Amino acid sequence: MARVTVEDCVERVPNRFELVLLAAQRARGLSRGEELTVDRDNDKNPVVALREIADQTIVLEQIRSDLVRSLARAPEPEPADEEVMDLIPTEQNIFGLQDVSAEEEASHGTAGMSAEELEAAIEAELGGRARR
């Protein structure tokens, strides 16, 4: 069989969607090192899997049970790596900028300033002239 088409396999697995699932499961098994039942002929694993299904050289019930087992298994949660931990909110300022809080404002003496005095202090801090 030079080329495998879905029509070659439909007689064995009438549902095309199930055929795709079974062939993909078998191809994953071949990638894990399971034994071939047909000659590879320089074909890739999905094509070999379809050829095995078409030639009826594999037991489909075994592939179905492997498929169900792989889908029923809950994946293990991945441990949070350092990059993900950096995205989790913390008490620290993540941007490395100075936090300005009410306590710090009070310690700088800006709490009792009027708007004009505050503007003048900002201009002086920035090296500019206060507008009047």
UniProtKB/Swiss-Prot annotation:
<keyword id="KW-0548">Nucleotidyltransferase</keyword>
<dbReference type="GO" id="GO:0006351">
    <property type="term" value="P:DNA-templated transcription"/>
</dbReference>
<dbReference type="GO" id="GO:0000428">
    <property type="term" value="C:DNA-directed RNA polymerase complex"/>
</dbReference>
<keyword id="KW-0808">Transferase</keyword>
<dbReference type="Pfam" id="PF01192">
    <property type="entry name" value="RNA_pol_Rpb6"/>
</dbReference>
<protein>
    <recommendedName>
        <fullName>DNA-directed RNA polymerase subunit omega</fullName>
        <ecNumber>2.7.7.6</ecNumber>
    </recommendedName>
</protein>
<comment type="subunit">
    <text>The RNAP catalytic core consists of 2 alpha, 1 beta, 1 beta' and 1 omega subunit. When a sigma factor is associated with the core the holoenzyme is formed, which can initiate transcription.</text>
</comment>
<dbReference type="GO" id="GO:0003677">
    <property type="term" value="F:DNA binding"/>
</dbReference>
<dbReference type="InterPro" id="IPR006110">
    <property type="entry name" value="Pol_omega/Rpo6/RPB6"/>
</dbReference>
<comment type="function">
    <text>Promotes RNA polymerase assembly. Latches the N- and C-terminal regions of the beta' subunit thereby facilitating its interaction with the beta and alpha subunits.</text>
</comment>
<feature type="region of interest" description="Disordered">
    <location>
        <begin position="100"/>
        <end position="119"/>
    </location>
</feature>
<dbReference type="GO" id="GO:0003899">
    <property type="term" value="F:DNA-directed RNA polymerase activity"/>
</dbReference>
<keyword id="KW-0240">DNA-directed RNA polymerase</keyword>
<keyword id="KW-0804">Transcription</keyword>
<dbReference type="InterPro" id="IPR003716">
    <property type="entry name" value="DNA-dir_RNA_pol_omega"/>
</dbReference>
<dbReference type="InterPro" id="IPR036161">
    <property type="entry name" value="RPB6/omega-like_sf"/>
</dbReference>
<comment type="similarity">
    <text>Belongs to the RNA polymerase subunit omega family.</text>
</comment>
